[in-house]
């Protein structure tokens, strides 16, 4: 029995990607490199992880990787770097708004295609990561939640720091 079909999943996944895009587009230049929170002494990610631009990149990077379903053989498109694969890494150079918006469009298309062509066999393919393993379809629900979490953090930051109102996207087109 099918409970959620491809179109339902895409409309909601696309909506969270669109809201992330709103945050990236609406960020004033003076906040692009500002941190949402202070670094922690025991964090395993690079110092500066919570910079607005980097949190956007982090979200897109993992969206792309999780749509692939495996770390092995994954590489983000140029000019982006592999990140967060090893403790103690350094931050990549600051990516521009335009670069991140192009990556967002790339990920949006990849997500729509991945969901639209997802077969029963692909949905149940087991995906393994350092933090655990789960079927590919469940990984996409995890992925959606991850994009929503960071998109909401960025939008809340813009509301607090720049008085920007977030527009709710109920469904992607």
Question: Where do the protein language model's features map onto the residues?
Answer:
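Acidic/histidine-rich alpha-helical segments that form the ligand environment
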Residues: 87-127, 135-150
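Proline-centered turn/helix-capping motifs that create local helix->coil transitions or kinks
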Residues: 28, 71-76, 114-123
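Basic/polar N-terminal segments that are highly enriched at the extreme N-terminus
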Residues: 1-7, 173
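Hydrophobic alpha-helical core bundles mediating ligand binding, dimerization, or RNAP-core interactions
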Residues: 13, 17-20, 24, 104, ...
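Short, contiguous alpha-helical
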Residues: 10-14, 18-21, 33-86, 128-173
